[in-house]
Amino acid sequence: MLAETASSFTAGTSDNEIAHKHIAIIGAGCASLSLAARVSELPSTNLHIIEPPYPVQADHVWGFWAMEWLDRVRPLVRKSWHKWAVITEHANTVMQSADHPYQAISRHQWLAKCREQAVQNGVTFHDSLDAAHLDRDAEIFDSRPPKVADGVMLQHFVGFEVRAAAGSFDDSTAILMDFRCDQSRGMHFIYCLPFSDRDALIESTMFSPQQAPPQFYEKAISDWLGKIANVTDFDITRRETGSIPLGFFARHDSELRGIGGNAGAIRPSSGYAFAFIQKQIDRALIGVKAGKPLHFTTPHRKIDLWMDRIFLSVIRHQPQIAPKIFGAMASRLSGDEFAMFLSGEATMGLRLKVILAMPIWPFLRALFRPESDAP
């Protein structure tokens, strides 16, 4: 392993005589390229990215709260919001944080920057493992998505980035959840990131086991723009769509060690992945510096995964109470607390505060309800 290889070098060994370790990662998504950009932190390592040919994916906006381990992301942040809102039929709760603003970056820009840094640091790209000509001692990690069974909870969405007249949007406040939309198919909310007073990303997002027809999401966006935001004249400049499995899943290939979502990086209750992938990689590299072998584990604490399992059970069986759940949480927590909880940085006191904000009976029933994907 890396630590063992490093410890075997003698003081008189020249750089040319040092045996480099070969590491390959299958897939060229967020996790593998984020690690590749930091390959200089892996001593005496040749990193190979296995990138089979596949269609170019559309751009996406990734959202997260600013945290210490995300400092390297800051130069690519498209927009920061120190205020964000959770809106139900009964309340509009605006939270704010000076230290942990909500932020957004472009998927394409992040991956391009990581790839550029990786190439500068000698990372090589191949279309197959065979093409990499790895020796038998090479370590292989798999970033392909984990295995997902039918019927699991999904976060699925369609988004429009729109341009409207100046003054159409309040770009000081991100709308994380606006539940004033059709709830007939499951937990459903509108997510709006205003990049300026005329440009915004609006997503129709659902948490449910089944996806809806495209027209359902598109109508929800149009209705929200026209009836809630009072924006009827706009151009769609970009579209995005996606589906993220929520739960606890087996690795893509049980014979290979995982990285990223294939090593438990995706937060089961929210689908947030980008920030947690960076945390996972940070921890792995800290371990390497401490003399441990490179290894990727879930960045989530066991108690948070336990709480996530209960939450997913509630939302699966009683989606109609989702507005009440998130409205209560937003009203009881400060902006900093909200950001820390959803970023996996909660204290026990904060977790208790969240639990006490929840409706008790649905969560008690979920506590004793068996779920097939429980951790």
Regions found by a protein language model. Name each.
Residues 262-283:
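A conserved FAD-binding loop/helix module that cradles the flavin
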